[in-house]
């Protein structure tokens, strides 16, 4: 039996479709015959239902995965307020310990063939005074998939994020263009520019360009993603 694969999903900003793309990837992996699970290790913004605290992003990931992880493994740190996690954690008296997340990820790898780990916010979102989301990806040792919210300014945001990923020694396995502004002029030209720059500077392929969907459908979006290309990149990046 081959070792499980895993990837870390980050984005150019918050609210640009990381959960949507992560869910679409889960559908694609399941269609490829893989047992696919998801982690949202740090989630900020919770609601109470049936006496338990839940998070909408984590719920969406659970709905897309064909392997359900225990909540304590899927989301080791569930914060109540929807704000910057290090600020909320300090106010709620929670220490966002990266080691705890690494242990949870190790356990998740025992339950599935592929694990999608969705980060919180962008790649440099602080988790503590001196640790950020990129440090988490480094500790997990995972290749990164970058979700680019296609809107005005996305070229600079994407290239800066890719530089931050490379600066930590993390492989950029690929990127996804997610059209969050349906009225954006020259969207295709922006995507073409990013395709050329990210391929040239980081050898990061475009995994798919997702049309704006209302309402969003991760299952439908999964058909626009090149899951086999991503799987090959993950296998190439896996420890020998």
Curated annotation (Swiss-Prot):
Catalytic residues, chain numbering: 40
EC number: 6.3.3.3
Subcellular location: Cytoplasm
GO biological process per UniProt: biotin biosynthetic process
Catalytic activity: (7R,8S)-7,8-diammoniononanoate + CO2 + ATP = (4R,5S)-dethiobiotin + ADP + phosphate + 3 H(+)
Gene Ontology molecular functions: ATP binding; dethiobiotin synthase activity; magnesium ion binding
Record InterPro entries: DTB_synth_BioD (IPR004472), P-loop_NTPase (IPR027417)
Enzyme class: ligase
Residues that span the membrane, as ranges: none
Keywords from the named record: ATP-binding, Biotin biosynthesis, Cytoplasm, Ligase, Magnesium, Metal-binding, Nucleotide-binding
Alphabetical list of Pfam families matching this protein: AAA_26
Listed NCBIfam families: bioD
Record's subunit section: Homodimer.
Protein name per Swiss-Prot or TrEMBL: ATP-dependent dethiobiotin synthetase BioD
